[in-house]
Amino acid sequence: MAAFGLVRFQAYGQTPPPTADPYANNADAGKLKFPLAAPAGKDSGAITTAPPGAVNQGMLDPAKWKYGPAYDAPTNSKIWNPVMIKMMKGEKVTGGTVFSTDSPQTYCAMANAGYDFIWTEMQHDARDWDAVGRMWKACPHAKAVPGVRVAYTDEREIQHAMDLGALVIVIPTVRSVEEGKAARDWTMFPPAGKRSQGGGQAFDPDMWGSVPGGYRNTINDNVVLIEMIETLDGAVAAREIAGLAGVTAVFAASGDLGNFSGYKQGTPDYERLINIVHDAALGAGKRLCGPFAWRDRPDFTCFQNASETAAIARGVAAELGPLKDTQGKPEVGPYAPKK
């Protein structure tokens, strides 16, 4: 639908200004000519015959369609997502978790605290996407880029995340290569995927609308896609999932691999599952992610850190040092020691 907004500007050889509104640049009625339109009241035969000069001739066949150059990234375009830059270099990447707040102020404090990206939790928290959009829009160019763990691999979840401006997408409980491929498809624009172009604040010039090369043409190269291996079925398919084009990293889920296997960290059965994910990432040349406690585990280079409430507690402890928890102890009242 948003492609209609390009008509007037393309007719004059201009580029439409970036905007979050997909209809803002619609051409005025009555000013367009349609030299290739079907004749009024007649079947044009377009399903079998292309107009003269068309690249794709013959019967319309999606499997054989030659995708056009309209959305090619500029030649030698540079990556503008700092997390992708670190991922490509194999450097260690940290994601601070925003779990329960919907406060833009708290989000922005986390985003400027020193993490590489913010893991906005949407699988296990009940906040809505409007709240997420407000948080991300409050400080779009903070030190940490906006990221999110969506609830599932469906179009609605991932489309909301991408249209709001996510630069890191985390997909939970990927159980098969089919699920992994679906997640990739909803994350990426054609021809790499199936993401619909429908506007959203990601296109706003105050967010990513003014990036070099344009958001639509460059986001496929910049979005970081992390797929989580959390189940036994996922472990079986881990090599295929890691090998998917467009998947940046696989995540060995420390909690749910225990939950779904019945074994705790450190036991042979549990560690076997983690090593399967490890081997899948190495074999595919992809990054390997896990909890921050595994910062020094071999070959792990991206991590989920604790939540905003845990970060506050750690920060206060570091600031107060020996003065932490030295409150006065009255003998009576609600602050008196419990007997």
Stretch-by-stretch model annotation:
Residues 30-41, 45-97, 208-221:
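N-terminal amphipathic alpha-helix/helix-capping segment at the start of soluble metabolic enzymes
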Residues 88-104, 147-151, 223-236, 307:
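Active-site mouth loops of central-metabolism enzymes
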Residues 106, 148, 153-167, 171, ...:
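Catalytic cores of alpha/beta
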Residues 129-155, 159, 187-193, 218-220, ...:
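Alpha-helix-loop-beta-strand connector modules within alpha/beta enzyme cores
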Residues 135, 177-192, 263, 309-333:
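C-terminal helical cap(s) of enzyme catalytic domains, especially alpha/beta-barrels
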Residues 168-179, 250-260, 301-320:
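Glycine-rich phosphate-binding active-site loops on the catalytic face of alpha/beta enzymes
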Residues 168-244:
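Conserved anion-binding
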